[in-house]
Structures are given as C-alpha cells and as structure tokens.
C-alpha cells in the first residue's frame, strides 16, 4: 500500500492463491449483485478470460473490444453503463503488447487486472477500487496473487459467497483464511523492498521507459523489422514485432540465441517476436537485443 500511495485510504492488501485467473471469478462473486450487471473492456486474451468467467453471474456488457483487429490497439471511445456494479479492465496485454495509458473517468467502481505491469509506472491508484495482479511478472514467483481492495465496496452483492472466494473473509483472516504460500509471499516482500530502495515506482518507471524507448526506436529505425500494435498503445513491458521478410528468420533466431537471449518468440496465437522488459530486466539486456537487430541489418545488406 505504501508503494501504491494507498496507505490510510481505506484499502486492504491481500496475498491470495489461485493466480489472477481465480480473480476472474472472485470479482463478480463479490461485486456483481444478483440481477446486476458488469461492464468489461476487451483488450486481449486475459480480458476475454475475465469476461467468460463473469457471464454466469449476470449481464456482462462488453463496452468495447479490439478483437477483430487481433487486439492491436486499445479501444478509446466507449461508454460505461451508469448502472453497472463495476467496470473491469486489463492494464497491460502481454501477448499482444498493448498497454492502457489512461483510464476512464466513471462513478462506477473500477477493477483492474494489473498482473503484467503492477509496480512498473506511476498512476493515481486511488482511481481503482480493486487492483489484482499475479506475482510472477514484477513482484515475485508464481504462487501468490496481490489483491488491493477498497473495503467500502464489499458486502453489497447479496450473494452467498463461499468463504474461500470472499474478500471480506480474507481481510478478516489477514490473508490466512487457509495456509498461505509463505515462500512466494516472502520473496515478494524482498522484491518490494528492492523496489523501494530503487526509489519506488517513480524510480523504476524511468528505467522502464528508457528500456522501451531503446527497443522501439530500433524497431522503427531498422528496415528489417516492424512493430505490431498501434504506436500510442505500445506496452513498456512487452514489445511485439515481426520481421518484414521471413527469409531472415532462421538467421535472426540463431543470432539472438547465440547472444544469450531466450524467450523472445511471440505467443503462438500471434507469431513474430515478443521482448518482455519487466522491472528486473536491466537495460543492458535490451541493448544486447538491439545490437543483434543491427547486426542482422548489416549481414542482410
């Protein structure tokens, strides 16, 4: 709460299990009233997963979607029903490489899945009523999920919520409703202490912006590569790009592997390449990839 600037503002921080995927279920259970409705923004695979889980609970309104464009942009022009019990969005989309740069002004409670960019940039986190994030991108190992919840929005759904899925139960038991994943929570604590020592979110944000700027500049400069998503929606966490000529793929793949890079193949549903630049990645690693891209350009001439 300290790092998010939410201390003393009526929020509780929970360390739960089940990954962010379980929150797809817990959010409607706790917030959608019987005969109520919820509004969702569909910006990618994880957003559509959350929508799927919400539908059995009641009317689930998809206010906008970029699915028909293969999620290459973040929809901007949409309205949120004023009678919705909450509005759900996904701040960063790992597979497609898009990121929300602004969030709608609404009187409806706002729920945000920040699994892949939590603690990466400064935001007014008090605009959100629930923030949830799987630990395994920017916070710690897989096994625990951070849920930050504004207490005043709970207890209004009128549902008989199973205890293990009830935020109020987890708050009353201080995240120990059942045996917590102690090692995952402990290592997350160490990561958050590391982040605080780097100047908090504002400190790491500068590093993340520098890393992303370095890679996107090369993607745009190098005639062998092209970016996949709308420029204004590019993610600082996940850069997606492709080769303009697939004839270079075998050479490029051999070059980046030889340079010690791993895991930049794009998701199987998208193809191409995806370079993930989470908080722990140093800018030197990004420079190695940029150098390989420049090398490929030279060898292709």
Where do the protein language model's features map onto the residues?
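Active-site C-terminal subdomain of aminotransferase-like
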Residues: 135-216, 230, 299-301
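Conserved beta-loop-alpha segment that forms the PLP phosphate-binding cup at the N-terminus of a helix
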Residues: 10-35, 47-49
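Substrate-binding/gating loop at the entrance of the active-site cleft, primarily
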Residues: 18, 42-57
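Conserved PLP-binding catalytic core of the aspartate aminotransferase-like
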Residues: 225-255
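PLP-dependent enzyme catalytic core of the Aspartate aminotransferase-like
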Residues: 271-301
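Conserved active-site segment immediately N-terminal to the catalytic lysine
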Residues: 111, 125-136
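Active-site phosphate-binding strand-loop segment of PLP-dependent enzymes
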Residues: 54, 65-118
């Amino acid at each position: 709460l300290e790092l998010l600037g939410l201390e003393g503002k009526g929020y509780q921080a929970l360390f739960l299990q089940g990954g962010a995927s379980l929150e797809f279920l817990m959010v409607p259970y706790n917030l959608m009233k019987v005969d109520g409705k919820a509004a969702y923004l569909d910006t990618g695979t994880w957003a559509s997963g959350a929508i799927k889980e919400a539908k059995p609970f009641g009317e689930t309104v998809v206010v906008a979607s970029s699915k028909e464009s293969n999620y290459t942009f973040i929809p901007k022009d949409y309205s949120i029903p004023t009678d919705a019990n909450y509005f759900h969005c996904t701040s960063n989309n790992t597979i497609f490489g898009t990121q929300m740069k602004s969030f709608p002004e609404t009187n409806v409670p706002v729920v945000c899945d920040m699994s892949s960019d939590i603690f990466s940039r400064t935001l007014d986190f008090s605009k959100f009523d629930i923030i949830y994030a799987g630990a395994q991108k920017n916070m710690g190992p897989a096994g625990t999920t951070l849920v930050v919840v504004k207490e005043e929005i709970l207890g209004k759904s009128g549902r008989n919520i199973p205890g293990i899925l009830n935020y109020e139960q987890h708050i009353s038991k201080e995240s120990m409703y059942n045996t917590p994943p102690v090692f995952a929570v402990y290592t997350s604590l160490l990561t958050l202490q590391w982040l605080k020592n780097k100047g908090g979110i504002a400190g790491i944000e500068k590093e993340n912006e520098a890393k992303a700027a370095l890679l996107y500049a090369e993607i745009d400069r190098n005639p062998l590569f092209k970016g996949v998503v709308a420029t204004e929606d590019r993610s600082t966490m996940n850069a997606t790009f492709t080769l303009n000529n697939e004839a270079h793929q075998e050479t490029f793949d051999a070059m980046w592997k030889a340079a010690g890079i791993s895991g930049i193949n794009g998701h199987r549903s998208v193809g191409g390449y995806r370079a993930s630049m989470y908080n722990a990645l140093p800018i030197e690693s990004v420079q190695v990839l940029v150098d390989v891209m420049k090398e490929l350009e030279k060898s292709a001439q």
